Amino acid sequence: MKKVLLAFDGDSFSEGAFEFACSLNKKDQILLTGVFISRVDAKNLWAYSVGVPPAVVPLLEEDIEAESENIERFEDLCNLNNITCKVHKDYYGFAIPELKRETKFADVLLIGSETFYNNLGLGINDYMMNALHGAECPVLLIPESFIFPQRNILAYDGSDSSIYAIKQFSYLFPELCDNPTVLVYCEEENEEIPENEYVYELASQHFPKLKIMKLGGDPKWSFRSWIGEQQNALLISGAFGRSPLSQLFRKSFVSDIVKEHRLPVFIAHR
């Protein structure tokens, strides 16, 4: 049984992320822990990011009421769908350190706030950006509207992080590894796939329906164009968290994929 965290920010309730959790539970029973995070003052966020103890921000009455409604809804839906669940809350004032601790004791974190997706690349959703940057387990970003993945896309660039993501996904979700899978490498100037034999030897043991594909041209644009044609797929990537915190989602190609193509994205970074 996997322990899955489902994070809710503010008064939002992600139908997409919950639906994804339900689908996982049907394939292999999970423990679903709902983590309910209240909104905080941005100054406290940045105080935490630079190591300054944040001030306590009291919750407004409407925030408390919205959180209570979300918790009740979460528990009712879990009971209706036969999902074993727990609720973690009471993060008054500043929840990011607590969410980071939660991820330390979880297998995977699901995030599906529509507000989060709308802000990718447009404005900085500081709150959830900090949460993702500090996550100590793999993260699944879930669009609100999607079809449960029937194919896997392994984004490979020869880096240790891309190999790490492939391994983490296969360990966590063996039930999804039987889906048709393509390992994609974007080449420049007729480059060979880095350590081709080794990566094929590893990936083919976990993904029996594996194909390898090379895309030419500028890696960012060729991959973006190709993935726009893919449907019902899940992207597995290690390319997260390489940029400075303040620029993370502006520079990460993963955020572009989530924002533009609304594919579920599995991210694992060391």
PLM feature segments, named:
Residues 1-55, 134, 147-215, 229-232:
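Small/aliphatic-rich secondary-structure junction motif
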Residues 6, 111-112, 154, 237:
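Redox-cofactor binding/interface segments in oxidoreductases and associated redox assembly factors
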Residues 36, 113, 238-240, 269-270:
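Short secondary-structure boundary segments
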Residues 54-69:
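A short acidic, glycine-rich active-site loop
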Residues 76-109, 205-235, 239-255, 263:
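Structural beta-alpha unit
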Residues 85-142:
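Hydrophobic alpha-helical segments and helix pairs
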